[in-house]
Amino acid sequence: MIVTLNWLKDFIDLDETPEKIAELLTNSGNEVEEIIYQDRFLKNVVVGKILKIERHPNADKLVVCQVDIGDKVTQIVTAATNVREGHTVPVSLPGANLANGIHIENGKLRGVDSLGMFCSIEELGVTDYDGEANGIMILDDELKAGTPIAQALMMDDVIFDINVTANRPDCMSVVGIARELSALTGKPIKKQDLSYKTNNEDVNKYLSVEVENKELCPRYMASVIKNIKIEKSPKWLRARLVSVGIKPINNIVDITNYVLMEYGQPMHAFDYDYLDGHKIVVRDGKIGEEIKVLNHNSYDVDEKMLCVCDANKPVVIAGIIGGLNSCVIDDTKTAVFEAASFNRASIRRTSRRIGVRTDSTARFEKGVDIQSPEIGMQRALNLISKLGAGEIVSGVIDSVSEKPENKDMTFSISKIEKLLGIKVPNEKILSILNNLGIKSKIDGDTIFSNVPVYRGDIENNADIAEEIIRMYGYDVYDSIDQEPLANAKVTVGRYDPMLQTARKLKLELCDFGYYETVNYSICSEDVKQKLLLKENTKLYNMIKIANPISEDLAFVRTTMANAMFTTIARNLSRKNQDFRLSEVGRVYFPKELPLKELPDEVNMLSFASVNKDDDFFTFKGIIENLLRDYDLEYRLEYSKLPFMHPGISADIINTKTDEIIGSFGKVHPKVCKNFDIQEHTFYAELNLDIITSLKEKKHEVKMLSKFPAVDRDLAIVCDESVTVEQILECVKKSCGKLYYSSNVFDIYRSEQLGENKKSIAFSFKLISYDKTLTDEEINQTVNKILKDLKYKLGAVLRWYI
């Protein structure tokens, strides 16, 4: 939030230095990130009047000017071609440091003294100006010679860049910051004159307003202004807007932006003649509707988007951006002003959906109270009247679902003291709260308060305790007796065991080329359908949030898959076609629904890849690496997860406890289609709580054998139901002490093998630590492998090398 010192002074008399003001705001919770002096590049720059221009004696393209700078006449040599005798211009004097980096000193140009320099707009850093912009800036002749240029251009303000916290939307305005300073300094807020003149006509004869969705639009106000004169705003208004980073457009648009910054109330202006039926309808959008907005982009409208419409079409995406089909233009004769309060969750959802965020959006997302439109409209009409910008039709249409009223609340002093750890005198509590506009009185242990509508963040003792301490001053804790801490036990901080496990595995995944992501642990109900979850299963039974921020985030997740697949889809849509992602997070399983006790929270690690070189065995290798340091024996079985490919996925099962540690494999093709991701997507998730409970394996160092190893390849034919894991486990047991390693390198299917049959080719390595293996010993081992495979798994030899 950007405010200026002079603007604040319209509401409160401040004699504190900018640095002191910044300190007060920062110490009370509104951190001032930067103080900018507008005149930082305008010091030693004054208004000058050119008295005489003569040709340079030694240069055809230079002229010598005698310039009145107020207290004296000085000489300046220039090559500018747009200056004339009698012109009023900005003159930078020795010692000036201009916006473009030029430092001004006395000098000579081709032998003639030049005691300063005329300035252009760029050299002064000016962005908005009445007059000639090419070459040297030509100023208004009414300006007095010697006047500091910062004063002449109304660029002598001090700008504060303030980081307003999310719970304080009332501070997203000049008046909001002024209220804070009033409480901090004890100086009263000045009463503002918001009066305006109207004609004798009735606004209802010009316009009708219908709010269909009062839940998403609890208040909508509209007024009509006739005989509008579209022109530049006066200099003071444009200077204010420029100082807070807003580009002036014209008087009507500038008024809406001025009210936005001054009172925090977003406003919009329509061209009355382009509103079909001279009617405004606030409703949900309809599928098939489209609107082209002020950024010249077109957006499809759907039923989840709140729109402001005329009788036939959307004219505004509510709370975000207006449409080109009804905006104020140079020929506008009659305008409609809008001031409204929209549901912040709805605005946030729509803003994310279309990818548009404006200053208005920022306010609505934090929350605009239901009283704000009334004050904003008054100020807008006051400015119309003050600037003579048009004729205001009598009356304001006001559709409001509930009358804005302050809240009567009670707070406990003893509970506040317990929260703060200190006792604040009752008279100080009353002084603080009353200065904040929270009219209060104390009776015994109870504070009776009347909380203003704009302080929607105050709900309980903790909130009021925060208000008291931030105004009382956190430095009070510096004087508290530290003796109770003298005998405190000091402990060494370290990661929780689960966090240690998560950190270890995350770093290993980084080594495999995985980027960590952080996703929401809440999701929409359509996840159940998109992930093919079956009703009344552990994954299907999700907890519904009582007060969701949006319909898209109304359930608590039972699997990490949805968030991961959504992130993959988002990356693919942005032409990122080859990547690996991981996430550590929690899933939540209710003991029963509806929820009667806290759910089970399970820490999970998930990772996924759309890399074209990754496959089932790549993931199997990664799993083996991640689990190699744990005392764990596990087996693989076909995965039962509905969103995994039934034939190219596996559950990891602890052989001792039969617990499922995790799952990995290819994502089900239907799920890939539902999320609009590649079919070549592989996904894995591991239960971090189970892994953390495992003992770490003690690694034993084995001597390298002095004798050569023997490699053999076998291909067998077996039933489709036989897994690779079963085959390799059988090979390992058959080899006994001679076993070193084994791996599958081919799986083959054909009609010749028979129905429901497959060929699996694998290699294995034999080694002895005592001697060189003989052919007889090798053949005996191979025969034992074939015999065990046949009798245990029904597999027969296809070929042997």
Model-derived features with residue positions:
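Phosphate-backbone binding interfaces of nucleic-acid-interacting proteins
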Residues: M1-E201, V336, R353-G355, D359, ...
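Glycine/proline-enriched, intrinsically flexible loops and inter-domain linkers
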Residues: L5, V63, I189-E289
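Beta-rich nucleic-acid/ligand-interaction surfaces
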Residues: D39-K43, Y196-N199, V490, N519-K538, ...
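Extended, well-folded interaction surfaces typified by the phenylalanyl-tRNA synthetase beta subunit core
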Residues: G176, M409-F579, R712, K765-I767, ...
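Terminal amphipathic helices with adjacent charged low-complexity linkers/tails
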Residues: T185-V211, G388-I416
